[in-house]
């Protein structure tokens, strides 16, 4: 992931780049440096105007991290964009751990000099180094830059606890794992390696405190849900197996950081849904096109039961999921593969999608409260839409449907999407235990699938992540808020079967 100061620098000067970049020359260099590939180039060239092509180049560089920033700086120098290169120079090949960035007004002399060298209107940060940093030779190879950037990203990990009021595991609970205090976190990527062993979660004393145990999940040992099935208000989910679950786990990328810790997510989810009665299929490290083909084949599979689960663990941005080839795929295109038109075997059946990926670069600093409250905050409560609410449509609902044999149903119905975070924000992942969101999903579902429908479960997940997890970046305490989008027409229960029962 690109450092925030570098990303902000590109964002502030986007108008300069969209006015002066020579598209063909820059693309040629970036493809030669393997920052972009030919598919990226075709996508950029398909943009309608030259200005849009220039903007898309900058956006593509932002998606590809610090290595791409340095390569972009080299490309500007080598193609005669001296003024634009001057904009990036203060942060090019800089070691973040030895520098403090801040915005400050230039002296008049410096301002006149920089205006003469660069296009008018750009802004560039000033850097003050704590220690002297040796300059990088202009003849440094791209591989050297890449290796140094990768090691630099490791040194920039945020050292903090990811859980609010977190209780440490018992001694030797994880003999092969780093302690919680030494775990590292980054938005969308974390550093270190995770164990492949399955874990389950149990609640410690006091609110929002959790302890991890190395034991199989035992959520199905409890009695099944006691309420009577009502076909008018509940989806049927009694087939054996309950259905199919596809888990796409992208860990290693061509340019973007490795998603260390995602193996723990995959193992825990595999264990969870197998115990819930699903046939689990895992696919690792898929390209953008590979994801689409895999989901398409999954949607058309002949062995579906009463419901279907799709889990995507990858890098992402708003409305896109990124494959291991760094190609972004529209989430709308993914969800369309699951609709009734493209997946007729899943028509009228609930399809639950979990997306563990960043949806932007913003970080949630939270807000102060007087005390801890378990209730849902008022700003999360949704009101009725005045135009599409029940009163507005009342007359249309009660009119008699004379001589109608078929009634139409939206093809996009019966889908629920659970996002790890809200739009434009990062999601967080622990290098040893996996992502906050998936940890909460496994804990809540293993405890309450027997007596809650999926919307209730995900509301509880929202509360667990919002109240039970946090990390720090300097003096800032950072939080995360999951989000769900429901197109379900009935309540959906997993109906887990009881095991180890005396009956």
Curated annotation (Swiss-Prot):
Catalytic residues, per the record, are 315, 358
Cytoplasm is among the record's keywords? yes
PTM annotation, UniProt: Autocatalytic cleavage removes the propeptide and generates the catalytic subunit p17 and two non-catalytic subunits p15 and p13; autoproteolysis is induced by ced-4 oligomer. Cleaved by caspase csp-1 probably at Asp-144 and Asp-374.
Give the UniProt keywords, A-Z: Apoptosis, Autocatalytic cleavage, Cytoplasm, Hydrolase, Membrane, Mitochondrion, Nucleus, Protease, Synapse, Thiol protease, Zymogen
Which reaction(s) does the protein catalyse, per the Swiss-Prot or TrEMBL entry? Strict requirement for an Asp residue at position P1 and has a preferred cleavage sequence of Asp-Glu-Val-Asp-|-
The record ties this protein, via InterPro entries, to:
CARD, Caspase-like_dom_sf, Caspase_cys_AS, Caspase_his_AS, DEATH-like_dom_sf, Pept_C14, Pept_C14_caspase, Pept_C14_p10
CDD domains registered for this protein in UniProt: CARD, CASc
Outcome when changing residue 449 to V: In n1229/n1164; severe reduction in catalytic activity. Partially processed. Reduction in the number of apoptotic cells in the anterior pharynx
- Site label Cleavage, positions: 221-222, 374-375, 388-389
- EC assignment: the record states 3.4.22.60
Known SUPFAM superfamilies for this protein?
Caspase-like (SSF52129), DEATH domain (SSF47986)
What general EC class does the enzyme of this chain belong to?
hydrolase
Q: What is this protein called?
A: Cell death protein 3
Oligomeric form and interacting partners: The active form is probably a heterodimer of the p17 subunit with either the p15 or p13 subunit which are all derived from the precursor by autocatalysis. Interacts with octameric ced-4 (two ced-3 zymogens per one ced-4 octamer); the interaction causes the autoproteolytic cleavage and activation of ced-3. Processed ced-3 also interacts with ced-4 octamer to form a stable holoenzyme. Interacts (via large subunit p17) with csp-3; the interaction prevents ced-3 autoactivation and delays ced-4-induced ced-3 processing.
- UniProt lists the gene as ced-3
The record's family statement is: Belongs to the peptidase C14A family.
Name where it's found: Nucleus membrane; Perikaryon; Synapse; Mitochondrion
* Region (Required for interaction with ced-4), start-end ranges: 389-404
